[in-house]
């Protein structure tokens, strides 16, 4: 049996390589289970988000990490690409589609602080780093007195800016690349990224969705391929798909698309499945937040999914409609006055 080489496009950051390596191993295992000898080769692609030092909110966030990977897919330079789903624009790209979403990691946001302090324990006027307007808005709502500092760089570099946090060189960067020095009291990052890099031990506090709603599809990976796909490759990729994670991501992303908001907008969402007798219920919470933390609107919605087969197209439609309903509720509550969603989008 001859070995088949599959080219997987990925960004070059430590986190992207860790995530893509995880997917590569999943695909090789799935192929082996079907009697095929696969080697998934990582193809590193540099993107604007990796090379620009501008703040993410100024880059707009809308696909800044995805465009070059998608170009490689369309040109046939790679067979598939792995994205953090939250980095993908909600508008579809002709000729491409999301072939699978592996099981979602922890979607929550995490605080990494000096001496393991929680947000409540940080001193008055503490400096907290984040590149996300969504996190800034919700941090300000919880602690109006703190100072937020815009933050760029990979995960180890960000952690290296927290006073008292020591990051080993094997975390994905060299000691010389750990930024400008320890000048912050804390940073806020995604739990999923810290876990995938083996850095979860540095988490001081994980925020529940009542405290801080995550970004839409945070913690979800998207495996993207050409629309016209080799049937064998399609069958193997399908084996790593997690329908529950896919439905949650679809509902959350429908909130963003209905609001016409970009990735940098102060919008949070969290969707999850619960058993309801012989059926499932898909629950969704969504919110829009003022950047100064002074105002917000939230919506809670649910939809019943009949039966146990979560892969049915009708369930995807219900998930989409659930997200649309939540977004319409937010708009009816004045989301457009709470945050200038269109202005945020236009900075992209």
Task: Briefly describe each language-model feature range.
Residues 78-82, 185-186:
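Short, Asp-centered acidic motifs that coordinate Mg2+ and/or phosphate
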Residues 76, 124, 182:
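Structured loop/turn residues at beta-strand edges in well-structured enzyme cores
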Residues 7-9, 81, 99, 129, ...:
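Short, well-ordered beta-strand segments
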């Amino acid at each position: 049996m001859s070995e088949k080489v599959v080219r997987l496009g990925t960004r070059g950051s430590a986190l992207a390589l860790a995530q893509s390596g995880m997917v590569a191993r999943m695909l090789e295992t799935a192929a082996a289970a079907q009697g095929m000898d696969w080697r998934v080769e990582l193809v590193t692609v540099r993107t604007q988000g990796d090379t620009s030092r501008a703040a993410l909110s100024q880059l707009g966030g809308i696909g800044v990490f995805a465009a070059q990977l998608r170009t490689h897919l369309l040109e046939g330079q790679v067979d598939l690409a792995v994205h953090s789903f939250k980095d993908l624009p909600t508008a579809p790209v002709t000729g491409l589609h999301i072939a699978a979403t592996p099981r979602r990691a922890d979607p929550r946001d995490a605080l990494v602080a000096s001496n393991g302090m929680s947000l409540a324990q940080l001193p008055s006027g503490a400096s907290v780093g984040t590149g996300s307007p969504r996190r800034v808005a919700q941090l300000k709502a919880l602690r109006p007195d703190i100072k937020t500092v815009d933050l760029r760089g990979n995960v180890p570099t960000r952690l290296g800016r927290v006073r008292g946090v020591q990051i080993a060189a094997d975390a994905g960067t060299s000691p010389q690349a750990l930024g400008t020095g320890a000048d912050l009291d804390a940073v806020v990052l995604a739990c999923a990224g810290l876990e995938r890099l083996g850095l979860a031990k540095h988490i001081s506090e994980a925020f529940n969705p009542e405290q801080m709603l995550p970004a839409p599809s945070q913690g979800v990976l998207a495996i993207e391929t050409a629309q016209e796909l080799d049937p064998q490759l399609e069958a193997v990729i399908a084996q790593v798909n997690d329908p529950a994670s896919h439905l949650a991501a679809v509902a959350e992303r429908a909130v963003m698309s209905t609001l016409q908001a970009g990735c940098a907008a102060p919008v949070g969402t969290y969707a999850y499945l619960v058993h309801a007798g012989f059926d499932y219920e898909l629950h969704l919470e969504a919110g829009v937040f003022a950047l100064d933390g002074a105002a917000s609107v939230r919506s809670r919605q649910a939809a019943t999914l009949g039966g146990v087969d979560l892969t049915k197209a009708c369930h995807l439609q219900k998930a989409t409609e659930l997200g649309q309903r939540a977004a319409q509720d937010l708009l009816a509550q004045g989301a457009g006055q709470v945050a200038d969603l269109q202005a945020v989008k236009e900075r992209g």
